[in-house]
Every structure is written in C-alpha cells, then in structure tokens.
Amino acid sequence: MTPLPERAAALPGIDDAVLHAVATGSYHDPHSVLGQHQVAAAGIADPVTVIRTLRPLAEAVFAVLPTGAYLELAHLAHGIWQGVDIAGPGAYEIEARYADGSAWSADDPYRFLPTIGELDLHLIREGRHERLWTALGARLRDLGGVTGTAFTVWAPHARAVRVVGDFNGWDGTLHSLRNMGSSGVWELFVPGVGEGAIYKFDLLAQSGDWVRKIDPMAQLAETPPDTASRIAVSRHEWQDGEWMRRRAASDPHTGPMSIYELHFGSWRPDLGYREAADQLIDYLGALGYTHVEFLPLAEHPFGGSWGYQVTGYYAPTSRFGSPDDLKYLIDRLHRAGIGVLLDWVPGHFPKDDWALARFDGQPLYEHADPRRGEHADWGTYVFDYGNSQVRNFLVANALYWLEEFHIDGLRVDAVASMLYLDYSRDADGWEPNIHGGRENLEAIAFLQEVTATAYKRNPGTIVIAEESTSYPGVTAPTSSGGLGFGLKWNMGWMHDSLQYIREDPLYRSWHHSRITFSFVYAWSESFLLPISHDEVVHGKGSLLGKMPGDHWQQLANMRAYLAFMWAHPGKQLLFMGQEFGQPSEWSEERGLDWWILDQPAHRGLWNLVCELNAVYRGAPALWAHDNDPSGFEWLDGSDAAGNVLAFLRKDGRGEPIAVILNFSGAPHTEYRVGLPFAGGWEELLNTDADVFGGSGVGNFGGVTAVEEPWMGSPASAVLTLPPLGALFLKTGR
C-alpha cells in the first residue's frame, strides 16, 4: 500500500480505537473522521485539507477532484485511506481500485453537511414537530447537483446506526450515520440512492448487539411477507380543491354522515387502489353513502389482523399499490362527493423484532414497564404516551394522513384500552397513576393533543372514538377538559338494539327498554351508531343471521332495524355486505357474497339502503340536530305490548319527519299516532314496500292527520303499520 506522503506525516494522529470503530461502522460520529476536513498540521502555517474515506478491500484509492485530477490516498489503518488536497476544500468523488482489476467510484457521503436543520432538531427534542415526516425518514435530496437520499432516524439509545439496503449489499459498514446530539437523531446523505431503493437500519444497542429495523417514518414498504422499507416519491397532483374548500368551511356534526365501512382486501379481492376507484365510486354513489371508512391501510405484516397491528405507520400498505395510487383513489372519491375516513391505531403495536419493538435495543416506542407497556390479550406493546417524542410520532402521524392523503377523518381504535391503566388486567397487573386512580393520564393528554391539533390544522375534519366505556366527556371540547373527539361510537345502542332485535317478536314486549334506553343518553355525547366489522366475525354471524324467523322474516326484521338505525339520533355506519343481507359471516380471506344480489329479496334490501340514504340526505330533520335534544320528540315510546315506537325528528324549520316502527310480526290496523300538525302527511318511506321485498302493507302513500290530540300531540292520524316494518312520514304543509 502507498505510504503516507511526507506532508501528511505532519498531521495529528487519530486514536486507533476510533479508527477501528469507524471501520466497523460502530462510531457515533463518523463524519468527524471521514470526509473532508481542515486540520492544523505541524510545521505548516495554514490549515490543510485532508480527505479520508473507508474502502477496506481496495488496493488503491483516489480522490477525483473537479479538475479531473486524481489525488492518491494512502492507507491509514483498518481500511481507512487518507490524503492531503493541496487545492483546498471542494467537491470530489472517491475511486477505489481492487486486486481483480475492478474499480468503483461515487460521491463521498461524508463530505456533505447535515441535511436536517437546527429548527427540525429543536422541534424533535421538544416533541412538537407537527410535520415530522418532512424531517425524518428517507428523503430524496439534491445537494449541489448531487442527487441522493438523506436518511434520518430517531434512536436515542443507540451507540451507532448504519443504513443497509440493496444499494450496499446489505452491509452498512460504509454507511454509518452521524449522531445529531441531544435530539437522538442520526443522519446520513447517501449519493446515488434513489426512488424505489429498499433499506433498513442497523442499530448498535447499549448491550453491544446489533438489531436490524425498518424505518419507522418510511412512506412505503415492501409487500408482505417482505418487510424492508422502500424509498417513495409522490408525484400526485390533487384535483379535489373544491372538496377541500367546502370541507374547511363545514361542520361535520351538522351535516349528513352515512358511512360505509370497508375492508379493502376483501371488498372486491384483487383490486388495487387505482383499479378500485371506478367500481367503488359507482357502488357508493348508487347506494347514496356520504362517506366510506377504510379499515386500517397503514402497513401491517399479518393480513389476519385486518390492519390493526401496524408496523409502518406512515406507509400505506403496498398490497394494493403505491401511496400515489391511494391518493388517486381518495382524490376520485372526493371529486365524486364522497368523504373518506380511515381507521387509525395509536393504542398498540406488534412485537415483530424487525419493527418498532425495542427499536434501539431497549424500550423506546413502548412503555418500559410491562404493566403499562404490554397488552396481554393482543400480544402487543403499548405506546409510551409520556414520552414526548413518541407522542409526537403519533400526533404527526394523524396529521400526515389528514394532510398528505386528504383523509377527512380518523376513527381511533380501542380508545378504552388507552384510557384505563387496568384495562383487561388482573388486580396486580397494573399500576395506579400519580393520584392513585386508574386513568392513564398520559394517554388522555395525548388524545387531547391529537384532536386539538387535528382540528386546528385541518378545519372540517373529524376524529372519531371507538370507546366502549362511560368515560365522561369523550366528545366534549378539550378546552373544558374533554377528549375533543368529534364523535363517539355508541356501543350501548349497538349492544341493546341487537339484543332486542334477536328476540322473537312474540317476546319483544318484555325487552322494550332495550330499544328505548338509548334515547335516555342520546345527547350525552355526540354519537355515531355502528354496525361494524366487529359484529359480523368470530362466530357472531352476519347481521342477517342475527334476525329471528324464516328468511322473509329475517329480511323484514333487518329492513325495520336499518330504518330504526337511520332514524335514530346520531350518524350511522354499516359494514360492507350487510347492505344486501350477506348470509355468511365476513372473512378477510374471501370476497363478499355478491351473487346474492341476484336474488330479488336481497336486491330489495339493497334497494332499501339506497332509499334510506336518499331520504336521509334529503331530510335535514334526520341529521341537522343529531347532537341536540331539540331535534327529537317522542310521539309514543311506551307501547311495549304492541312493539311500537313513534317519534319525531326535527330540523328546527318546521319540516319534521315522523318515524313509526312496528317490531311485531303482525300488522297494526287502525293505529292512532299523535302528530304535531293536522293535514296531509306523505309516506316518505315504507320498509314493507314491494320494491324492498316487503308484503306491500301500508297507507297508500299518505295519511291525513286531524286536530284530535293524542298522547300530548295536538293532532293525530290513524295508520296501518306493516309487520316488522317502519314508516317515515313527511308533512305535506
């Protein structure tokens, strides 16, 4: 090997242990050794420019200067080469020659300044970087005409970090990141690495062991079962400006919201994001839904988790296409007038050893105490909500989906598991908070931060809680101590109403309170009524399968039940397949039973859902005052013997909708119902109509109310109530 030139012999020495650590990729600050440096040399007045590079197997190494001149470097130690550039600091490339006659040349990653700025580092230290995805991860950069990728990762416990990938043979020795101080961030710009490259990080734990991990901030990943992160570039140009302007000026609470919940992989199997656009828009448009809610689309390794065990929080699953393909789908939905909601899972994450778990060799994203850091039921870890950087990771992730993908709302999964320290734990399996209580104060503060930040930055969006307890103030504003959610799933309504509708009509009178109790607390929170995927799996059967009686009676019960759901105060959500009465339980492994739409009875149910949505969207009484008791009035909630409910939904403008439900198996003739006005009332909807598969019992399109008071109402009308049916009446005034 070439000896050091005489001038280099006057350079200050570097400790051999440091050189060895650099050579093995285990040094925290490789840029302090490698790259280009101005150093003082003994006997020389001015600083000299020293170039050092790591090429452990080379026979000869040169720095190729902008002039085209070759500066030969000498071997220093452990594969590190060094030379003095008499021309002074400037750009250069490294060329290495090997014993087999091959040569390699590239820009030196260690000659570049940090690609992450002081403001970014300050915000990360403080846990306040609301656009974290623009600072961390893998970002394509052009630095002085040199294109490449800036890799940045937060790993505060690591002793060293290397990036490995298909661009370096999965050997990160030549690509060690520098530590950026107290921020816990590591950074390296690698020239020549571009879009589509796959990579992971190798992290040296305090224990001395190396762990290989995906990038927590990656915006794309390999398709499972492969797990590497992939460099992505977005080129999508949004065309939904009008939708976004309307959204920012609207209040989702006072508008219609009818949600179709969808598991992407089993709605129509083999469709990708882009390919699904036309079919999904046509289908949702025909049904009349205002919104679609996707089960989680963030990357997850196990399809059987339905997306609820996330490993790539910033990466849409690549099973169905690229991030731009998903943006295209959302863009198309918006232009078709359909809002998009997304399930979001900040409550727990899986223990896969290549993902977030023990990320830098010890608990980082998860709480270190298993009493707070593990979900035994699910076999997952729980985020450490008291760690400001972990909280920042999650808050920024919510914003990422809202802002980068134009998502209109997030449904937060398993909120109850976050709120309570003793959730699904034995008496000795949890630790009280600082006040001796069971509430998880850090998680509560996190949820408040998520909702407040989401609404501040993205007006018109909504954050929805799947929360199954009686925790107070879930939808109360954070300014008054609430969690700030826009809506809460009404699990009480769901459980009670399903228990009621399962009963044979002969025995429902004994369970009348189950169908009326939800009206007692309907305005204690802002509610959404869910018949979700959770109710049609794990042996629960389909919604149709919950209905008693023969096939006709099952469908009639279901028509009446859905009408009750649409008429009840609160927004509504129905899982895919239930709109046409799928008989079989849902499975993520196969598609829906689309063939059953060829059967007239099931097509009739589908027609009813179309009509329910059309009536709903056109009648502000059914949605304008969902969260205000002034939008509801009982006409008769006490007829347990007849299995009848009658109530008004009101819009505040004198155009109410009267809803009369007969959950008995027989028609009621000459049935008097109180109404607020005398005069004609149009039969706006009859679930027993022939077109819906019913028996055709009804009131010939309308009734006339007379000024005969009844049960507190100033007028009344005599009706025929169809069996297992619902009527919506609209005043003809």
Swiss-Prot record:
InterPro entries: A-amylase/branching_C (IPR006048), Branching_enzy (IPR037439), GlgB (IPR006407), GlgB_N (IPR054169), GlgB_N_E_set_prok (IPR044143), Glyco_hydro_13_cat_dom (IPR006047), Glyco_hydro_13_N (IPR004193), Glyco_hydro_b (IPR013780)
NCBIfam families on file: branching_enzym, PRK05402.1, PRK12313.1
Alphabetical keyword list: Carbohydrate metabolism, Glycogen biosynthesis, Glycogen metabolism, Glycosyltransferase, Transferase
Protein family membership: Belongs to the glycosyl hydrolase 13 family. GlgB subfamily.
Pathway: Glycan biosynthesis; glycogen biosynthesis
Reaction equations catalysed: Transfers a segment of a (1->4)-alpha-D-glucan chain to a primary hydroxy group in a similar glucan chain
Signal peptide per UniProt: none
Cellular component, GO, one term: cytosol
Active-site residues, as the UniProt record annotates them: D413, E466
Enzyme Commission identifier(s): 2.4.1.18
GO annotation, biological process: glycogen biosynthetic process
Domain of life of the native organism: Bacteria
Enzyme class, broadest EC rank: transferase
Subunit note: Monomer.
Function noted in UniProt: Catalyzes the formation of the alpha-1,6-glucosidic linkages in glycogen by scission of a 1,4-alpha-linked oligosaccharide from growing alpha-1,4-glucan chains and the subsequent attachment of the oligosaccharide to the alpha-1,6 position.
UniProt gene name: glgB
A GO term, aspect molecular function: 1,4-alpha-glucan branching enzyme activity
Name listed for the protein in its UniProt record: 1,4-alpha-glucan branching enzyme GlgB
